[in-house]
Amino acid sequence: MTHQTHAYHMVNPSPWPLTGALSALLMTSGLAMWFHFNSTLLLAMGLLTNILTMYQWWRDIIRESTFQGHHTSIVQKGLRYGMILFIISEVFFFSGFFWAFYHSSLAPTPELGGCWPPTGIHPLNPLEVPLLNTSVLLASGVSITWAHHSLMEGNRKNMLQGLFITISLGVYFTLLQASEYYEASFTISDGVYGSTFFVATGFHGLHVIIGSTFLIVCFLRQLKFHFTSSHHFGFEAAAWYWHFVDVVWLFLYVSIYWWGS
């Protein structure tokens, strides 16, 4: 490593942004091929390229931060700002779905029967699986906070236990959501109700899967003693993201499942 007189991380040339862009092209093109020609070859290639890119890019970042010492306090401060801006962008992303839902539900058109839910739609009971899902995510918020406090106190065993419980609850939530989709009496093609319901809850479910993956990586890293009480931004970012997913679900539950039904 060349000598430098500043605390900033000058990133070395990397192929992963290019392969990541290629995987995005393959996945979007693959989705179009799947929808129109029932061919999943391009989509599978895109997913494989994306998984390989994620693994190798994360490997490089872990090497730079944990073993090479590139992530100084100034670099970590910049990463924190970046994560905050990313979460803010996600807030606006989900705001669009809530806007679409309330635009359609507060003033139902004659085509919908002048009522909400639209005529012929039988919404899910908010006091059954959706309420259980809410309890699961709230419990996962408690366990991730426990894991964070345990890490700050240097209690590795409790940190791993809290993280494992959070991951298990995240997987359980995903399975419950999948069963709910399977048993729903309406589909994404059933007008504006079906489209707003499945797009909003579906993207939230995708974020739960992403967050669970994020936490699994943190769990595997902690098994290798990568985190300390003073150097653990990877885990902190995962915890922020998970709390954001929790809050979005509360808004989804109150708006779409409870009020919208």
UniProtKB/Swiss-Prot annotation:
Q: Which CDD domains match?
A: Cyt_c_Oxidase_III
Show the catalytic activity. 4 Fe(II)-[cytochrome c] + O2 + 8 H(+)(in) = 4 Fe(III)-[cytochrome c] + 2 H2O + 4 H(+)(out)
All ranges on the Mitochondrial intermembrane side of the membrane: 35-40, 106-128, 184-190, 257-261
Annotated membrane topology is: Multi-pass membrane protein
The molecular function terms in GO held by this entry are: cytochrome-c oxidase activity
Stretches assigned to the Mitochondrial matrix side: 1-15, 67-72, 153-155, 224-232
Q: What keywords does the record list, in alphabetical order?
A: Membrane, Mitochondrion, Mitochondrion inner membrane, Translocase, Transmembrane, Transmembrane helix
* EC numbers for this chain: 7.1.1.9
Segments passing through the bilayer:
16-34, 41-66, 73-105, 129-152, 156-183, 191-223, 233-256
Gene Ontology BP, a term? mitochondrial electron transport, cytochrome c to oxygen
- Assigned protein family: Belongs to the cytochrome c oxidase subunit 3 family.
User: Under what name is this protein listed?
Assistant: Cytochrome c oxidase subunit 3
In the UniProt record, what gene is named as encoding this protein? MT-CO3
